Design a protein with these regions (language model features):
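Active-site-adjacent betaalpha module
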Residues: 1-138
Length: 138
């Protein structure tokens, strides 16, 4: 809430796993056209770099970053060069296999924290995101 009133802040309600998809707003519902508040924000401010943080590294953060990379690569944000993931400001959850089974969940519900965090970072970096341990010098 402390940032909500700042003139350089754009708040986008996140109502789905992928914040980029959640930022799509229908303009003319009858015509199926829309715009995206993330793209609008990057373009309005002519941003060259965005920094992404959040929970869960391998789910929400990764989906948003990979979609932003694709949108950038398709020239939807002409000034955007770098999408940075600040690793210390990202995290994910731990759900050991035994706990998943005890809860009556399928084995596929298991979510080993260290491995899935690493996998999320790996996939983002392999597609072009910059992984950073600090923001100094960016």
């Amino acid at each position: 809430a402390w940032l909500a009133g700042h003139h350089d802040v754009t708040l986008i309600r996140k109502d789905c796993i992928n914040g980029f998809v959640g930022a799509i707003e229908p303009t003319f519902k009858a015509h199926g056209t829309s715009h995206n508040r993330c793209i609008d924000w990057v373009n309005a401010h002519r941003l060259q770099t965005i920094v992404t943080v959040g929970i869960c590294t391998d789910i929400c953060v990764m989906d948003f970053v990979l979609t932003m990379l694709s949108a950038r690569n398709h020239a939807l944000m002409p000034t955007l060069r770098d999408i940075v993931v600040l690793e210390p400001a990202c995290a994910t959850y731990d759900l050991p296999l035994e706990v998943a089974r005890n809860l009556g969940l399928p084995d596929t519900a298991a979510h080993p924290k260290a491995e899935t965090h690493h996998m999320g970072l790996y996939f983002m970096a392999s597609r072009g995101a910059i992984l950073a341990s600090e923001l100094q010098g960016l």
